[in-house]
Each structure stands twice: as C-alpha cells, then as structure tokens.
C-alpha cells in the first residue's frame, strides 16, 4: 500500500501551498516509506508516498503518459496489468509499475475504463490538457480513500482522513465502486454487479467452480517483487489462503526471486486458540512459521496509536485491529512488505455465527449483501490500515471480483446453516476444498468453527479491554453520553473510552460521521438483530455474544434432527468432484 494526497483547484500555487501539501503528505508516510513524489500543475497537486512492491527501482509516482499531459497518483495493485499492456501496444510505458496502465487506459478510453482494472486501488488522475480530473476507488473499498472540500472551492482526496481533516470544511469516506469526475460534476457508480440489488440468485452450487475461482484469486496475488507471507490464524479462511498459496507458489515468479518457502505469521496471547491452531496448520503445510505473543497490557498501551491509524471508534474494529497492528510491526522488522489475508469470506458466505439464525435464504442473502457493502467501514479498513501503519501491504483474495461474482451467484439455499445435514457456517467453501486425494487441510481444521480475530487471539483480550475502560469511564460519564456525544452515542464504557480518544485526534463532525453506528450482535448489521429477540439484550460485537450458536448448539441441533428423522437421513448435497 501507498499513501496518496491530491488537492485540485485550490487557487494557490505559491511555495507556501506546496510546503503545506508536502507537510500533509508526510502524515501518510507510514503507508509508503520508500519514496515521496509530488506533481504540481498550476493550482493542482498530486502527492505520493510509495511502498515499493512492483518494480521497486523505477516505479516511483506520480506516473504519467508519454508526454506527461496525464498524471496519476495511485495506491493499489493492478493484477491484470500485463494483460492490459498487451492491449496498449501503441503506448510507450516509462516504468514496470503495474499502476502505469491507468494513465494509458485513460488516454485510450477516457473515463470508461475503471471496470477493466482487476485489483485493489484508489487513484486520482489529472488531465492537464483541460485541467479535468477523476478519482476512483476499487469495487469493495479494500483500499481506503477520502474526499473533502475546502472553503476555496478545492477538492481533496487522501488515503487517510488525517491528511485532509484539518484543511477541509467537509469530508467523507469515498464510496467504494465509484468514480468522481470533474467533467460530469460528481460521483457515479462504476461497479454494478448482479448481486448489488440484493435479488436472490438461483445458480446451483458447483464446488469445483468455487474452488477454481478462489485458487485463481490467490494466484493473482502472488505478484510481487518483494518478500511476502500469509497471515495464518489457523481458522478456515487464513488456512485456505496459506494452503492454496503454497500449492501454487513454486510455479510463480515470486518463487524464482525469493524461493518456494512460504512464511506464515500469527499473533495471540499466551495459550490463545489462534496460536495453537496456526501452529498446527503451519506444521501440516510445512511453512516457515512466525509466532508473536503479546500481553493485554501491550495491547492497551497501543490503543491510542491504533485509533489514530485506523481512524475509527467502532468497538469491533479496534479490538481486532490492535493485535494486527502489533503483528504488522513485527512482520516489517523481518523484512516482509506484503502479506495475504483472509478477510471477506464471512461476509460473502455467511460465516459469522449469527447467520445460524437466518430465517430463510432471502434474508440470509440480503444480509450478506449488506455486509459486503459495509466491508470498507470495518474489516477492509482494519486489514489495510493496521498493516499500512508499518509499511506492510495486505492483499485479500476472498474479495477478488471474479470470486465474488461466483460466490454471490450461488443460490443461498446452499449457504444456509443446517446442522441436521452436517452443514455448519461456510459449508460451501469447506466442501469445495474437501479433497480426499490431495487434501488441502486436515478435516478438523477444514471444519473448525468460526472465531472472530479479536476472540481467537485470546478471550482475555476483550475482557482486559473492558476492565481498562471501566477504570477510565465512570457511571456518571456513561449516563451523560448522549449529551457529550449526541451523534452515534456510545452505549458501553468501552465504546465511550474509544470515542474520547478518537475525538482527540479527529474533532470535526465530518470525522465522526465516517464511522457507522447502530446495534450489532456478533458483527451483524442492525437488520439482522431482528432475527432473535434475545439479542437486543446483549449487543456485544464479540462472536461470543451469539450465545447458543457455538459447537454445543450444533451438536444439540444435529441430535434433535437425527432423533426426529430416524437413521435414514441422507445428505442430498453435492460432494466435491461429483
């Protein structure tokens, strides 16, 4: 990941303004410590802080077309850049950067090229021939981007809020899957997949199609000119990422540069579920595994810094971001600049424990759609900013556009959790990789139940955070919360504590509006809380809050179903390879 800042139409091309842009861009340097670039054209500025992953020697930004009339500052990775270059043979490229294709695609197609990009990205492009500009963000919002407006009529774009919040009167999170065009006067959606309107799909489940789509997604993300690894908690998602990456690493260009030994990384409190499971998977796969232990106090000491970098006061996100933030620092110290991570699977496939309560396939599917649309405010934000705080890039194969299209086209009847048929959450994914001849993972790992990252690193982590917040927030403070924080009022002492830290760094109302609110149970949307009347009394975002939906509940449901149906119960669903 890199850091970008663009200021356009600020009616000021003085040296003082240039110095201010450099100062603000410096706030993003943790994202891109390798090099800094600045392009100025009259009263327009494009700044860039580079993390060099592809073509480290010549890919400095901003990037240009042949005559430098088009300039672009990009934060992202374009996985199909070689294919796109083949379609642009009449163009002369200056670098080997994957992102340079953006300038040339604009020359060739105008503004209608964004959907041709396969990757994660946020960019701002300036056409100096008419001083027009566009900005765009990837389909799901893997890559962060904010847009702001100055009193002088200027439009601002930045990878993180901290680079524009002081100088903009109003700002907001740039919506995923959108393009901003100065010519057309605002935002419009470029990403319009079939699932976006939330209509229930009807494609039958084919395990091999799903498996192949995910393998392709992982293979794409092995594109790197620097050392990389995989974040491995030992849960289903990270274990599959590691297993697939290892299976295809030897034939990749990355292996020719860095060898075929895969590095994996895990963090947790002493004796945590993730450390144990991660070690077991690493031993099975034969990876070079790196374990990092932290204490509750280590995490508490980092909370302020985490909130500054993550730019949220959402309880779930902060709980999960803190260990990831600590781990990323350790990873960077080992010389690793890119990691693969397992975000997105739970949203796409209904992996959170509360999906057990979905009343029917329609509501199940609609909830997955809502969760995917909100990913940029939660898991994408965490994965990107926790790692980028230390100059590490996180890639998320489950959010590959093609894999998403395949997974979201499956009739959700196949995704429903049905213990009587042996189907726990994400059964369609588990079954797709249940290969008897060439196993990807041991059975008990392949069918390990979901743990939220903040739970899996050790249950005492969340309890420690609550205890710490209780010491800093009194009953009186919480009772007056609606007066102190009338917008998105915190309902717990932990939420109040995080909010006070956030407001210290980001005091403007526009900043607090970038953080979503509303009731949630075990990471659900507010709508899904309606699925179980008891949840409204226990709105803790931890996975443990979905009481009665853990392993014991599954066993009870299966036993009850077996007793009811007798011994002739047959699972009619397709097995992998049939």
Swiss-Prot record:
Disruption phenotype: Pale green leaf phenotype and reduction of biomass in mature plants. Increased levels of asparagine, proline and ammonium in response to salt treatment. Residues 210-450 form the Asparagine synthetase domain. Pathway: Amino-acid biosynthesis; L-asparagine biosynthesis. GO terms for biological process: ammonium ion metabolic process; hyperosmotic salinity response; L-asparagine biosynthetic process. L-glutamine binds at residues 50-54, 75-77, 98. The active site is at residue 2. GO terms for cellular component: cytosol; plasmodesma. Induction: By light and sucrose. Down-regulated by dark. It comes from the Eukaryota. SUPFAM superfamilies: Adenine nucleotide alpha hydrolases-like (SSF52402), N-terminal nucleophile aminohydrolases (Ntn hydrolases) (SSF56235). Expressed in the vascular region adjacent to leaf mesophyll cells in the companion cell-sieve tube element complex. Its EC number is 6.3.5.4. The record marks 343 as: Important for beta-aspartyl-AMP intermediate formation. It holds the Pfam family Asn_synthase. This is Asparagine synthetase [glutamine-hydrolyzing] 2. It comes from Arabidopsis thaliana. The lineage of its organism: Eukaryota, Viridiplantae, Streptophyta, Embryophyta, Tracheophyta. The gene is ASN2.
